[in-house]
């Protein structure tokens, strides 16, 4: 995959990566309590072909999506995924366990 994914970040502290579900985008995470961003840096990544993230026709499966998200994510973070985002987070953990802190 060659396209860069869209991401939104806010807050300071240990990194949390937020991955939305199928047919959604980063906006689903904007309703999280502001208090969470006080103690963490939240990075919501839009999956390939969702929201402002472009689709790459070379995408073949979850591992490709996970690689794209790893490229957009902070160096080490706790990943939180909703639905499809959870599957992508699990794939990322299998590909690069040293990049995920939880």
What are these regions, as identified by a protein language model?
Residues 1-16, 34-41, 71-76:
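Alpha/beta-hydrolase fold catalytic core
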Residues 13, 21-24, 83:
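Active-site glycine-rich loops that stabilize anionic/oxyanionic intermediates
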Residues 18-21, 44:
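Structural cue for short, hydrophobic secondary-structure segments
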Residues 20, 40, 50:
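Histidine-centered active-site/metal-ligand motif
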Residues 22-33:
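The serine-hydrolase catalytic nucleophile loop
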Residues 24-25, 50-53, 87:
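Active-site loop signature of alpha/beta-hydrolase-fold enzymes
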Residues 31-34, 43-80, 94:
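Active-site loop/oxyanion-hole signature of alpha/beta-hydrolase fold enzymes
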Residues 76-102:
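Conserved hydrolase catalytic core segment
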């Amino acid at each position: 995959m060659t396209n860069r994914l869209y991401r939104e970040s806010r807050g300071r502290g240990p990194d949390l990566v937020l991955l939305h579900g199928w047919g959604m985008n980063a906006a689903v995470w904007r309703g999280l309590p502001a208090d969470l961003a006080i103690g963490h840096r939240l990075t919501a990544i839009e999956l390939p072909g969702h929201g402002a993230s472009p689709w790459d026709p070379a995408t073949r499966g979850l591992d490709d999506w996970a690689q794209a998200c790893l490229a957009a994510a902070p160096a080490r973070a706790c990943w939180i995924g909703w639905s499809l985002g959870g599957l992508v987070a699990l794939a990322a953990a299998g590909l690069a366990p040293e990049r995920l802190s939880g």
